[in-house]
Amino acid sequence: MSAAGVPAELNNLGAPITATTQNPSGLANSQVTSGPVSSATQHDEHRSSAGNTLADEEDDKAVEAEKAEAIDAAGDGKQKRLPADSSEDIVAELEPHHVSVHRGKEEFAALERKYSNLSQRSQHELHRPTTRHSVRSSFSRKDRVVSRLTQDDAEKAKEGEGEFNLVEVLRSGRENQDEAGIKRKAVGVVWEDHEVIGAGGMRINIRNFSSAIIEQFMMPAIKVLGIFGFNPFAPKPKAILHPSSGLLKPGEMCLVLGRPEAGCTTFLKTITNQRAGYMEINGNVEYAGVGWKEMRKRYAGEVVYNQEDDDHLPTLTVAQTIRFALATKTPKKKIPGVSAKQFQDDMLDLLLSMLNIKHTANTIVGNAFVRGVSGGERKRVSIAEMFCSGATVCSWDNSTRGLDASTALDYAKSLRLLTDIMGQTTFVSLYQAGEGIYDQFDKVLVLNEGHVAYFGPAKEARQYMIGLGYRDLPRQTTADYLSGCTDVNERRFADGRDATNVPATPEEMGQAYRESEICARMTREREEYKHLMAEDATARENFKQAVLEQKHKGVGKKSPYTVSFLQQVFIIFKRQLRLKFQDHFGISTGFATSIIIALIVGSVYFRLPETASGAFTRGGLLFLGLLFNALTSFSELPSQMLGRSVLYRQNEYRFYRPAAFALAAVLADVPYNASVIFLFSIVLYFMGGLYSSGGAFFMFFLFVFLTFMVMSAFFRTLGVATSDYNVAARLASVLISFMVTYTGYMIPVQRMKRWLFWIFYLNPLSYGYEAIFANEFSRISLTCDSSYTIPRNIPEAGITGYPDTLGPNQMCSIFGSTPGDPNVSGSDYMAVGYSYYKAHIWRNFGILLGFFTFFMFLQMLFIEVLEQGAKHFSINVYKKEDKDLKAKNERLAERREAFRAGELEQDLSELKMRPEPFTWEGLSYTVPVPGGHRQLLNDIYGYVKPGSLTALMGASGAGKTTLLDVLASRKNIGVVEGDILMNGRPIGTDFQRGCAYAEQQDTHEWTTTVREALQYSAYLRQPQHVPKQEKDDYVEDIIELLELQELADAMIGFPNYGLSVEARKRVTIGVELAAKPELLLFLDEPTSGLDGQSAYNIVRFLKKLCAAGQKILCTIHQPNALLFQSFDRLLLLQRGGECVYFGDIGPDSKVLIDYLERNGAEVPHDANPAEFMLEAIGAGSRKRIGSDWGEKWRNSPEFAEVKREIQELKAEALAKPIEEKSNRTEYATSFLFQLKTVLHRTNVALWRNADYQWTRLFAHLAIGLIVTLTFLQLDNSVQSLQYRVFAIFFATVLPALILAQIEPQYIMSRMTFNREASSKMYSSTVFALTQLLSEMPYSLGCAVSFFLLLYYGVGFPYASSRAGYFFLMILVTEVYAVTLGQAVAALSPTILIAALFNPFLLVLFSIFCGVTAPPPTLPYFWRKWMWPLDPFTRLISGLVSTVLQDQEVVCKDGEYQVFPAPSGQTCQQWAGAFAEAVGGYINNPDSTGDCQFCQYRSGQAFFVPLEISFSTRWRDFGIFICYVVFNILVLLIAARFLKWQRR
């Protein structure tokens, strides 16, 4: 195997070398062989049924030589046509829209430049070969060399040093496969009567808080009805794709076109067996004669779908992402002498080189929230990953979104090349496909609302539509023309034709196609292929044999996976380890959090004495040590659910079984979690003074870690068992509350209510706690110190007659003590008090292992059986229509028909623009980077005149968005140099308000409807004096303009639950247009993600705005020639932020073309100037034409003219008097108007955010109910006295639940605010106040529900003064938690950082409030300042004193402390004075035998020693209010000064 033949096993990652082409008749296919064929028999096996064959092998070689010569000629820039009379039916002349494999091969030389871009070899090469003849063990006798990339590839490769010959690599791979006897995979796709039925037929209203509650209680009834086949809420079936048939042969590419909602995505998914989410799929789909069911079961990884969004694990590098995919798909059968690692290294090198992303190999992939590679590079990672799947049938959904024109063409040609040489069968849907892209396809499928309007040869599609009666639009690209014919607003009929005599409706177009000659031809071709597959099973058997040869040992013949289950586990295990240990921030914060918490807890319980006073606190220390680590595992729940989309896609590629992922993920977490828990245990254990021995410590660590693993498995299981995070969170809140309550710490098992004690035995925490409790107490003996001796001396009360040491008539007041014995065995203490026994330790170990095994089994079962992140088609939900909305929608419908008929046009005459020129001179922008600074923009000049539309274009990463941000004053980091002037003067405070900026990211308040989003923009950004009705009318005009009539009342939502990508983009533009910007309109990629017609509509409207006097600066990625011609002026940037052209485009781009040609770039007559200019300056992966274009621009007369024009514009502007306007303020509206409007929107948003509020209320109800059932109607016993305090302590749990919800909500809302604040819609103070005020109604509702359940359920005092105070404290607790959460969120840049504050705050507040560690037991350091500073101290103090004041206490049997009276004395005489002094009583004062002492007579006796006073409860209330006020001040200040938006 040669160096160029690195991927000799490409057959195992692709399909056969043969490439299917069509002869002029379109009926038959012929095969192009990319490498020598080993035998005539093998050659015949790949022969087309209707195509001609080569006479013999010599003829074959001759043709191959001619093709190679043609390729070489093309590489030299010459044109050499293959013989027209060759046996492969290669036509001599190619028609304008003709697509053939051979013309693609003539362009291979260009692809060699475009996909290599490699630098000269350096000492940092990834592989060893450095000379043309260096050979590795895996190379064949043909020593071709694949040049290697270095970190400087992107720049050096432009100079053409070391070209990467992709054709040679792929062909060599084929030759080596044949030599090794590796079978080829050739799979044609046949679909017949293929029909897809989805949900539809009913308008779904927006869910809100009330409907969520109703659903919760109605859902059980609905499910029961569903069992009997009756569901009134079931969606009605709707045909998404109507029956259609077709064939795509191996080596063919099909372009799928259609307007949004035409069914393109549905076709791509279902044709590749992605059937989840649809109600019904009818018809038949076969793959080389293999039925879709068998294909799904045994060969699922051979038929794959690539979604539009690029969803990867963001913290893995590009190389790691691709290498992982390769590892799971490395075939067993490879070229002799090639190891698995060599194969993976070579394939990785090939893919990085081929896709020109080698310079990003060690850069993390990133996503919308994690900074990584660019969007275009991320798209290429998706392409590489899908290629690694080795699939033979691939479908790509809008894969060029976000790519510039040159890169998009590169991508299309790469698919063409891979399809040709690898024999893949490829379906692609694209928006805005240029002519160069369209020419790569063999066939095209045009869909119109699910009906097939055309399926056949791509070269004949345009003429077919013209033949139907549609007018030819020569300036439109073929792809746009075809999809435009399905759009009633865009299509044009030929002269003398109209909708009455031309197939116009979807049904009519479908019928016309079915009756056409092309359809008949496609039918014959399909039947011939089916007949061939039925008669000759060679292709099918070769495919099955090739798949079988890939499988490793341990993989079943019927399994769709390549490597065994254990191999999958190992591969995933390594990936998860990398994920964990590459997250340096997460690791460091995890260790820091754990150690700091351990230090705090350990210092509170520092060196606990082995005495009676240390018994309860020792149990508290053990409980906290176990509970903290166990609940830390809760983080597994969101992480399990967030990774579903990647898991689902990679499982669809059949990289691994989901169960393998479940097992590997758990194993990979062990090293990190064990290390964290070990350090935590060391600090806590030895600081707390627990039993000092190695065996005791490691037993403690073992059970803490094992309990953590059990809880981790439990939360993972919960995550895979539920489809919605909010549902999982609600379940978790209930289960965690039960687990914590029934651990055995607060309530020993023998004292639990009989109807709930069984929870203790189903609770993993109880077994872990008993084990560490028994491990500790079985090793120690407790000495009774004086404060626990009964009776004892109390000098301050004048009681001094008792022995100084415990005598025979005294006892220790702890469990397990006996009269006269000063020592209490730890075993007796835990046996009597908790029913814990040392003998249970290893029993509990086995039980915990059983729990772990059970949860892991359930997790692996659920993750295999239940759908994990399956993508369903998007649905829209609508605001319920009232009378006003109905009238507006009827008016929109009427006007829509008038617009279609050409009777109406948008009236822009009322727009008021300020005719002021906008100029910039010498503009540079520099940002700080590690180790120095980086210049992103370099000395740029330009201007925008009133009434002009200026395009800003350039390569990805050239600085287009950066320039827009700088010009729009959106940057808040770095240094901007140069002058930015409006009307010849520095920009003023009203500049940002007077400009509109449609950003590339479509960031909106997701709960608003389209109409509401536009209305809020109009209300807050248009001057306040403009009447509301006028603003509303203008919003309706914008809705018409953007063709959003049917979506006007649809909620914006988020992907798969709301508007589609292209509709969301139109809303983004509409929001900015609704502001009626007076100064300038900036748009960043307004047409990205839109189909050609939508893009043209947007640009057409921008032209209308310009005609009304607007100034517009707009970046654009993939304009076709017609779209490009709509712009007046162009600003072109090259990499490095340098301007290479600024000036007029001219009619037919004449001015721009003249400039390019004068500087050495000859523009082909049929080229799209927008694409060619990018290639000329090296914007794509092709080498630039000529020398530095930036230097050429700076030395050009055009540049000098630009500077002169800028000076003229400035002089003219300065000569005019300044027009003073009263509304030139920072904000368009007053503070109160902003507050009122934004508060209304936020209230609506929270009301519609149903799951957010319902989850919060549900948690309060659940905890309140659990506490009530646990402590139901407590009596007046000592035990009940303590339980009252524990019940009150549950009020401190509420802030933990609230913080977990409030912080993400605030931070996500802040993202929307940051976008809107950039446009000066409203102030940060308004944002913070509305976020706070809108939460208050829900805080009140939660407080009422929790109070009613807790207060009256437990049986607290009924007096209104007590109940009223208790409710006020609960209400303030709710408000405090909300303000604290929002303050923490305002101080935090991300949700993760905010979440890191929570453990510190909650642990501190809970420990120091006086319940788990009473104030007298706290170390002096903490007791002096932290206990009085703790907000929960005020909460507990106020509630405990209110509930227990004057509470009578009567001991039950078993609660008395029993000790004998001295001979000759009664119990009253012996202990009466003591009992009176400590607030207890003697139950049998006259007895001379055993005395029964009750520790408490009233509630005061319990809380006074804890330094709690009933008289200070209103002071505590006031101090608690002060904490709320403090949080609000922090919130307002942080919101004002901390935007956390680096731009």
Swiss-Prot record:
Residue stretches making up the ABC transporter domain: 222-474, 918-1160
Residue stretches of biased makeup (Polar residues): 18-41
Subcellular location field: Cell membrane
Glycan attachment residues as annotated in the record: 117, 208, 398, 823, 1223
Membrane topology qualifier: Multi-pass membrane protein
Region Disordered: start-end pairs: 1-85, 119-157
Any Gene Ontology CC annotation: plasma membrane
Function in brief: Major pleiotropic ABC efflux transporter that confers resistance to structurally and functionally unrelated compounds including azoles such as fluconazole (FLC), itraconazole (ITC), posaconazole (POS), and voriconazole (VRC). Is also able to efflux the eukaryote protein synthesis inhibitor cycloheximide (CHX).
Protein name: ABC multidrug transporter AFR1
Gene it is expressed from: AFR1
